[in-house]
């Protein structure tokens, strides 16, 4: 996984609860002379929420994030992929909800497709064998995914796609990763980003590990030791960070005041995701990132 700066930085989509975006004819826009009139972030968010309410004449379409699971022609999806990714995406959804609520924007979060009560994965089997896919295969995989979704009546040019790639190999505690792991741009209509799937990847792996498991992980260099906790923080954190790019969020840094909470998600927050569940400070959403998601 590498940090990639996305060139297209337009607002895409994140679903807001109807109570927050619904029409409210009694809402009046407060007046002010200067943005600096607001003495706190909470005052800013209250004002912005009132503006959004007053300009909403109809409920917004509940447009959902499409999660695609891609795997090669000569392989099957990685073990327990549906169960693990249901847990991962539910936690990511909860992260956005909690952070947006903390910033004063009610229950704003990503909207996920569900099937039989769990996350719906659009499974796409590639046309090439495993050996033909690498970290640089994003464009190739994108084309195959777009074609497969088109056959299902989905126009990928108007969707936000998180493509989870089953491009890794696990041999006991040795993990080799060769999946695309980056965003490929976003605007108000669409976005696309890639992440990797591995057998050891799960929400349980973010919580204290009494067994003190050490993995040997190879991605861009040789094998490196990772605790199970660090492995899941880095790669689930990488998933939500790249999804941020898919939702048009640029890289940013926390203000001095914000930094007391931990690390900005769209800064180096992919390396601190859910560390607060164990020891230390985790990742958080900056107010500037939140504003792009409204």
Question: What does each model-identified segment do?
Answer:
Residues 183-220:
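A structural motif
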Residues 218-239:
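Short pre-active-site segment immediately N-terminal to the catalytic Zn-binding motif
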Residues 63, 189-191, 261-262:
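Residues that flank catalytic or metal-binding motifs in active/ligand-binding sites
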Residues 234-250:
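Active-site recognition of the HExxH zinc-binding catalytic motif
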Residues 29-185:
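Propeptide-to-catalytic entry region of secreted or membrane-anchored zinc metalloproteases
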Residues 92, 246, 266:
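An active-site-proximal "capping" alpha-helix that borders the catalytic cofactor pocket
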Residues 1-27:
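Bacterial Sec-dependent N-terminal signal peptides
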């Amino acid at each position: 996984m590498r940090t990639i700066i996305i060139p297209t930085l337009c607002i895409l989509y994140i679903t807001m609860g109807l109570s927050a975006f619904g029409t409210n004819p009694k809402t009046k826009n407060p007046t002010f002379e200067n943005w600096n009139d607001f003495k706190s972030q909470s005052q800013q968010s209250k004002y912005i929420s009132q503006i959004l309410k007053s300009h909403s004449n109809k409920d917004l379409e509940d447009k959902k994030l499409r999660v695609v699971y891609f795997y090669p022609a000569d392989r099957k999806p990685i073990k327990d992929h549906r169960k693990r990714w249901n847990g991962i995406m539910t936690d990511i959804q909860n992260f956005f909800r909690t952070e947006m609520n903390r910033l004063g924007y009610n229950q704003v979060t990503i909207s996920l497709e569900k099937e039989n009560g769990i996350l719906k994965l659009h499974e796409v089997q590639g046309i090439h064998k495993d050996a033909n896919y690498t970290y640089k295969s994003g464009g190739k995989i994108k084309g195959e995914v777009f074609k497969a979704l088109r056959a299902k009546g989905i126009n990928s040019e108007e969707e936000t796609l998180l493509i989870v790639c089953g491009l890794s190999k696990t041999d006991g505690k040795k993990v080799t990763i060769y999946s695309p792991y980056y965003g490929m741009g976003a605007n108000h209509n669409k976005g696309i980003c890639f992440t990797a799937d591995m057998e050891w990847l799960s929400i349980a792996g973010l919580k204290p590990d009494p067994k003190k498991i050490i993995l040997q992980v190879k991605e861009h260099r040789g094998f490196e030791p990772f605790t199970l906790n660090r492995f899941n923080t880095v790669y689930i954190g990488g998933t939500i960070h790249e999804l941020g790019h898919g939702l048009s969020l640029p890289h940013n840094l926390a203000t001095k005041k914000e930094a007391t909470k931990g690390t900005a998600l769209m800064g180096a927050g992919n390396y601190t995701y859910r560390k607060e569940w164990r020891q230390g400070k985790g990742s958080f959403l900056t107010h500037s990132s939140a504003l792009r998601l409204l």
